[in-house]
Amino acid sequence: MSNTQLSYKDAGVDIHAGNELVERIKGDVKRTRRPEVMGGLGGFGALCALPTKYKEPILVSGTDGVGTKLRLAIDLNKHDTIGQDLVAMCVNDLVVQGAEPLFFLDYYATGKLEVDVAADVIKGIADGCEISGCALVGGETAEMPGMYHEGDYDLAGFCVGVVEKSEIIDGSAVKAGDVLLALASSGPHSNGYSLIRKVIEVSGANPATDTLEGKPLSEHLLAPTKIYVKSVLQLIKQADVHAIAHLTGGGFWENIPRVLPATAKAVIDEKSWEWPAAFKWLQEKGNISRYEMYRTFNCGVGMVIALPEKDIETALAVLKQAGENAWVIGKIENLGEGSEQVEII
């Protein structure tokens, strides 16, 4: 038996580094603050009041990660935008139900805490919260020796929002004749990255040095996920939105049916837009079928919105004013017997 005195640091956990990180991120956290938030960092739990404007407030919650986009970001030493991806994946899922995001928490786990890297990641999380009007109220930084390879870390996010009970968007109002609008994506967002990494492997591409349309391939593939919260909330105020689908894992085939009644079918016109260069590159280099592309990737479409034809002009104007690239991508029809709920023509 050794007489050597052991400390937590000897076991690989540096409490000082954790405290240093907290000090580093205080400014980032502060800029996301909402008036409903009570107290600051350091409490055992974060306190947040409900906004007073809601008569029958319904809380909406979500949790997500960024998948293996994180592997690519780590490999390319690009840590400052993956946090925005994390927030986007959560808040975009909330806003499709009409909810305004209130607060966000993150979980950051690593084998050895590298303060500079973690601070970059959390700055990105704060950026995402600021873009979506959501308060970063806390999180957990877990330093776990022996659990991760050197330099690796993992991320998860948790978000809570609120919506007026009478204004929940659940797809039940969708009917034949509704028009479908598309909101452009900023790239692959945070889905399909295991296939993206496989394409990089089999093609021998180097994302850091290879270029596509005049900029590094890495910029196309690591472009931060677009956050649609403020644009969509503005649209909901001015148009009769029947349903919104966030195109994440499962692509067109799986996400659009999630917001359709069992009797409805979405008909998508693929001639209405051109795939961005990154998706053409992926399909060509990976020899990926059209069906698989639409199942795995958003192919340039971040959200699909169903609304009555009478509201289309207003909706397009509102979205343009909000800085979105939006267009008519299809329509809703009655579902025929033996037919699929999504048809891409």
UniProtKB/Swiss-Prot annotation:
Top-level taxon of the source organism: Bacteria
Protein location: Cytoplasm
TM ranges: none
Coiled-coil features, chain-numbered ranges: none
UniProt keyword annotations, A-Z: ATP-binding, Cytoplasm, Ligase, Nucleotide-binding, Purine biosynthesis
E.C. numbers: 6.3.3.1
Catalyzed reactions per annotation: 2-formamido-N(1)-(5-O-phospho-beta-D-ribosyl)acetamidine + ATP = 5-amino-1-(5-phospho-beta-D-ribosyl)imidazole + ADP + phosphate + H(+)
InterPro entries in UniProt: PurM-like_C_dom, PurM-like_C_sf, PurM-like_N, PurM-like_N_sf, PurM_cligase
Single GO molecular function: phosphoribosylformylglycinamidine cyclo-ligase activity
The keyword Nucleotide-binding is annotated on this UniProt entry: yes
Pathway as given in its UniProt record: Purine metabolism; IMP biosynthesis via de novo pathway; 5-amino-1-(5-phospho-D-ribosyl)imidazole from N(2)-formyl-N(1)-(5-phospho-D-ribosyl)glycinamide: step 2/2
GO biological process, alphabetically ordered: 'de novo' IMP biosynthetic process; adenine biosynthetic process
SUPFAM superfamilies: PurM C-terminal domain-like, PurM N-terminal domain-like
CC annotations in GO: cytosol
Class of this enzyme: ligase
Family to which the UniProt record says this protein belongs: Belongs to the AIR synthase family.
Name of the featured protein: Phosphoribosylformylglycinamidine cyclo-ligase
Lineage: Bacteria, Pseudomonadati, Pseudomonadota, Gammaproteobacteria, Pasteurellales
